């Protein structure tokens, strides 16, 4: 009689974490940068249909990396939660912190459950205040951990390299032009070269407190980006993202 197969809880959690991290790292980075008038989101995303950055509510935005179908489900759930809370109580009761806590609970439950695979996603939830001191930026990992970020944050892809570039050059209270140029340059930076990303390959959005409308979220189109970025030299598209690896075939037990 063969012994039952046993995996320790520690090893199981480690394997699930490694699985999620590998899936997230295969995508391209998203950078969030606080500037004088709000919060900027920049991602290299050639797709015009599939967005990594979206509006959740009046002053709240959502950004994600990883598997699109998984973070799109989370985005839709966040929009519904915000709408229901704003309708049942008051629009001011819808906060970025409350939404981040809801996402953390969902991601943590999925990660610790043995019934399904962990989500291969990381999220930003951002909210702007009437002044820069009231801005909030939360980063959520695949296992439901929440970090309160300040100044800038990066997730997905070569996040460490991009974050190091931003750390060396970031300054508080920058203009939108300076923030866009810094964020785009950081996404094109690697340890071996600096690449000029075409404006058409960029997804850029802001939470802008100076907008007169109650909804502070706005996307920056390629024409506006070209104006902000100025002359940068010849652009170069990114190499194709690696496809998901094929699963290894099972190994037959010895006869």
From Swiss-Prot:
The record's CDD domains line, in alphabetical order, gives:
proteasome_protease_HslV
Q: What domain of life?
A: Bacteria
Q: State the Gene Ontology terms under molecular function.
A: threonine-type endopeptidase activity
Q: Where in the cell is it found?
A: Cytoplasm
Species this chain originates from: Nocardioides sp. (strain ATCC BAA-499 / JS614)
The set of disulfide-linked cysteines is none
Ways its activity is controlled: The formation of the proteasomal ATPase ARC-20S proteasome complex, likely via the docking of the C-termini of ARC into the intersubunit pockets in the alpha-rings, may trigger opening of the gate for substrate entry. Interconversion between the open-gate and close-gate conformations leads to a dynamic regulation of the 20S proteasome proteolysis activity.
In what pathway does it function?
A: Protein degradation; proteasomal Pup-dependent pathway
Q: Which GO terms describe its biological process?
A: modification-dependent protein catabolic process; proteasomal protein catabolic process
Q: Does the keyword Cytoplasm apply?
A: yes
Where is it mainly found? Answer: cytoplasm
Region annotation (Disordered) ranges = 224-255
Record-linked PROSITE patterns? PROTEASOME_ALPHA_2 (PS51475)
What keywords would UniProt list here?
A: Cytoplasm, Proteasome
Enumerate the transmembrane spans: none
Q: How does it assemble?
A: The 20S proteasome core is composed of 14 alpha and 14 beta subunits that assemble into four stacked heptameric rings, resulting in a barrel-shaped structure. The two inner rings, each composed of seven catalytic beta subunits, are sandwiched by two outer rings, each composed of seven alpha subunits. The catalytic chamber with the active sites is on the inside of the barrel. Has a gated structure, the ends of the cylinder being occluded by the N-termini of the alpha-subunits. Is capped by the proteasome-associated ATPase, ARC.
- State the InterPro entries in the record: Ntn_hydrolases_N, Proteasome_alpha, Proteasome_alpha-type, Proteasome_asu_bac, Proteasome_sua/b
Name the GO cellular-component terms.
cytoplasm; proteasome core complex, alpha-subunit complex
Family annotation (PANTHER family): PROTEASOME SUBUNIT ALPHA/BETA
Tell me which family the UniProt entry assigns to this protein: Belongs to the peptidase T1A family.
Q: What does this protein do?
A: Component of the proteasome core, a large protease complex with broad specificity involved in protein degradation.
Q: What is this protein called?
A: Proteasome subunit alpha
């Amino acid at each position: 009689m063969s012994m039952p197969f046993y995996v320790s809880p520690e090893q199981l959690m480690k394997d699930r974490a490694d699985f999620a991290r590998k899936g997230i790292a295969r995508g391209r980075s998203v950078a969030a940068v606080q500037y004088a008038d709000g919060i900027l989101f920049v991602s290299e995303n050639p797709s015009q249909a599939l967005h990594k950055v979206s509006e959740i509510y009046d002053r709240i935005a959502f950004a994600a990396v990883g598997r699109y179908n998984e973070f799109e489900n989370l985005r839709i759930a966040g929009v519904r939660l915000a709408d229901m809370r704003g309708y049942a109580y008051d629009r001011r009761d819808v906060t970025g912190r409350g939404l981040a806590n809801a996402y953390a609970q969902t991601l943590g439950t999925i990660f610790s459950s043995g019934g399904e695979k962990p989500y291969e996603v990381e999220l930003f939830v951002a909210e702007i205040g009437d002044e820069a001191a009231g801005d909030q930026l939360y980063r959520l990992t695949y296992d439901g951990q929440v970090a309160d970020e300040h100044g800038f944050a990066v997730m997905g892809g070569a996040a460490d390299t991009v974050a190091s570039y931003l750390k060396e050059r970031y300054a508080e209270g920058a203009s939108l032009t300076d923030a866009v140029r810094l964020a785009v340059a950081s996404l094109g930076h690697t340890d071996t070269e600096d690449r000029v990303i075409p404006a058409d390959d960029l997804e850029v959005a802001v939470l802008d407190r100076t907008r007169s409308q109650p909804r502070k979220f706005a996307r920056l189109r390629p024409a506006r980006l070209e104006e902000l970025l100025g002359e940068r030299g010849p652009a170069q598209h990114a190499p194709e993202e690696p496809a998901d690896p094929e699963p290894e075939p099972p190994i037959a037990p010895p006869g």
